Structures are given as structure tokens and as C-alpha cells.
Amino acid sequence: MMEKHGGKVTSDRRAGRRQHGQRCSASDAAPLVVVVILIVAALFLILGPTGSSSFTVPRIRVVFNEPVHVAVAAPPPPPPPAQMQAGANASSEEDSGLPPPRQLTDPPYSLGRTILGYDARRSAWLAAHPEFPARVAPAGRPRVLVVTGSAPARCPDPDGDHLLLRAFKNKVDYCRIHGLDVFYNTAFLDAEMSGFWAKLPLLRMLMVAHPEAELIWWVDSDAVFTDMLFEIPWERYAVHNLVLHGWEAKVFDEKSWIGVNTGSFLIRNCQWSLDLLDAWAPMGPRGPVRDRYGELFAEELSGRPPFEADDQSALIYLLVTQRQRWGDKVFIESSYDLNGFWEGIVDKYEELRRAGRDDGRWPFVTHFVGCKPCRRYADSYPAERCRRGMERAFNFADDQILKLYGFAHESLNTTAVRRVRNETGEPLDAGDEELGRLLHPTFRAARPT
């Protein structure tokens, strides 16, 4: 009985162990199945087709030690274009600290307090300072201050600042050879007189600050001296206070807005000139005043489009409408290129150089009107055409300087130079009158004791 009972008990225990083993095997296999599925899925993602559209498994990327980025709400839609432009203009003026534009109902613009009795006060100053004469050697020519400049900010175009540097170097070369003082300005002295008009407050300031300067010579930054030997016939203008390049018939008969050009002009340091600046300036404040005068000039001057007032049109308007007041003291020069238009000049430099100076008609100043060297684009001409023309003008002028030292550009289209004269051990200007004049001008010679 016991054996039977014992055998039954033994068989029951074995059955229980089998059932327990089956239950344990099933529960232990479940995690293994999950692991296998994950491994297969991972292998599928790595090795399987990437372009399948029937099966997509989200990719999970765990990144450690990186900042947490919090999603933000989408920005509001932009305002209408007109509102954006108004906001941009307002913001620009606030950022730069400019005053609001002068309105037509505001008092007329003024350069400052009216200066009276200037000629007498200047004469007294010159008498008290004989070490700063208004006339200098050679031949007692007038003391001249050449004035130029550019905007205070860097150029938007990376090449622009380089072009301005070369243009200034050109002016320094000419002034050094001819004994002229030079002033380079990079500040807007009056926020209302921007753009073309910035020269007016500058000229007034320099006149009263430098009574020793008999003449102020304004030269635009994009005007290049291209005849480094040419000397202005100073005595021709002894009784005139303003010298402009242009044509009298175009100004007084045709009333053309391009009858003269203000890119390069001479103005005498005297009361008459201060009065002219005072009459000239009220047409230049930025904003509605400048726009209104631009419309007036378009009506009164032939060929002028109705854009905002520029200083050149304003001066011509004064000369035409107030000729009795200003005309007698204005000399309009056309016998040489005090302000030559670049487009008809820059491709003829080689021809001019081959012909030499027999006719004495090399272009004195080449002015790149319509080109803006500081901008990425030009006003009226392709930017590349302007850049190429300026490069040729710089090199044509620079060759006249390099020649003094025995070098020249390989061509006017490159900055590369070559030696054109062997050194002999003698002074470079020995036996060469032209070189002697440039290297050792008479105004630099010590006076005999």
C-alpha cells in the first residue's frame, strides 16, 4: 500500500515539476522574444531599404550633455509692406539719432548765424599772422586748401573702401607735387544736409577756421586727377570768387541742369562766398523741403527729372534766377577739364599717352559721374564698367608718379608694375626738366638767406 501510495505521490510530484517547468519556461521566453524583435527591427533600420513607404519606424536619438531646446510659439505674421517701410524708416532715424525731417511749414534752414564783416576781420587776422600768408610761392599764387571726403560708415561693397583709398592717394599725390594743402572729411557736420549737400556746412566751417586759405577747392571722392603736371591758371580767376567747369550758354541760355558741374570747383574765402552758401543751403534739407525743390528745379531747368533737389541744380537755379547778384563773380571754365566726364575719357588714355603733351590737352580731372564706388551698384552705368574705368584712371595718374622713380604699370588694366629706367647713380632728375619739376618743385626750395 505504502509503495503504491508512495509511487503515486512520486508521480504527482514529477508531474508538478513538469508543469512548473513549463510555466517557468514560458514566462522566461517572453523577454527574449521582445529582445529578438528589437534586434531584428534595429537590423532592419540599418540594413533594410530606406525608401520604403510601407514600413516606418520612428528614429530615436539620445544626445547627452546638450542644452534643452524649448519649442516656442510661431512668430506673428509680418505687417503690410507700407507699415514695414514706415517702421524701418522710423527705427533707422531713432537709431542714428537724426532729427525729424524739416517740414515745408517750418522756418527755412540756415547754416548758422549770419556772418557779417568777414572780409575786414579776415584781413585783420592775416595782418596779425604774417607767418600764414594768403599767397605763397611760386609766383605768389593763392594759398589753396583742397577738400574732399566720404561717408563716415564703411562701404557696403568690400571693394568700395579700397577705391576710396586709391582716390584719396591720387589727390594727395597731386597736392604734394603742387604744394596744396588737403583736408579729408568723414563726418556729417549737419544731419539735415546729407548726400550731395554735406559739402556746404563743411566749406563754411573751413573758411572761417582757415582764414589763411585764399581758395577752397572742393573735389568729389569719385573725381580723379589724371594730369599730374597741370597747374591751374590761378591769375585768370583773380577777380572771380567761384570757378566752375561748364558752359555759359548752357546755363544762361538753355537753363540746363547740367550746364555746370559741382564735382570739382574753386570758391574764394570771402564774404561773397559765405553769402552764396547762405542762399544756397535752404534748398538742401532732407525730407519734404528737398523733395519740393526737386519738383521746382524740374519745372525751371531744362532736361531735369523730378527727383529730390541736388546741390548742382540748386546752384544753377540761383545763377539763372539771380544772375545780377552772383553772375559777375562766377567764372565758368571750359578751356580745360576742371571736371571731365569719365565715359568719353577712360578708353583713350593709351592714345593720349602716345601722343604726348604737345597739344597740352590731357584730361585734368576725370569725374566718374553716375558711378558710386562705395556701393554694390552704380546709379546709371554697369558697376563693372565703372570699376574698370576707375582702375584705368588711377593707373594712368599713378604712372606719372611712378615714372619719377623709374617704374610704370604693365598696362592700365592691372596693378602690376615694371622697371622702365635703369638707375645710373646720378640724381633721378639729372637732365630731365619735367622730372625735376615734379621731384623738386620750386615751392619746396629753401629761400636764400
Swiss-Prot record:
Single GO MF annotation: xyloglucan 6-xylosyltransferase activity
Keyword field: Glycoprotein, Glycosyltransferase, Golgi apparatus, Membrane, Signal-anchor, Transferase, Transmembrane, Transmembrane helix
Gene Ontology, cellular component aspect: Golgi membrane
Annotated InterPro entries: Glyco_trans_34 (IPR008630), Nucleotide-diphossugar_trans (IPR029044)
Induction or repression: Down-regulated by treatment with atrazine.
Biological process annotations from GO: xyloglucan biosynthetic process
Family: Belongs to the glycosyltransferase 34 family.
Protein name stated in the entry: Probable glycosyltransferase 5
Organism: Oryza sativa subsp. japonica (Rice)
Taxon lineage: Eukaryota, Viridiplantae, Streptophyta, Embryophyta, Tracheophyta
